[in-house]
């Protein structure tokens, strides 16, 4: 990749399926063969996001994608504030002053509320470890839920998810 002009490598795990130890092993292997920065992007959909980032950081990843907590977690990336605090006082300290983030977080809490109200959005309210079985990216989960809700069928969300492995197999 480098000899073809790549300036960095981005690993995108949009469904949050990458396990912490798989991330560790992948990053370690890549760092042995590449000198360009490596970025990891994962989601918290199945509850592994923060742990995956911690193991990737330990393995030497250069960049992790996060989102401020009003837009983070669940089907999004780990929260910026949480990762900053988790890495504080370690050899991986980001040197980000988390206290400077709070006013920004407060602002985006209001922005999120306005977006939810304006677009009548319902966001999933908890992680779903079974996502590893369904293999659906976080954005698609939110979209699927809102489509079902628009049809008055949000109560069938779990049933639709359970059918996904069958659809994948049939295709």
Question: How would you label these PLM feature ranges?
Answer:
Residues 1-171:
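Catalytic cores and adjacent flexible loops of soluble metabolic enzymes
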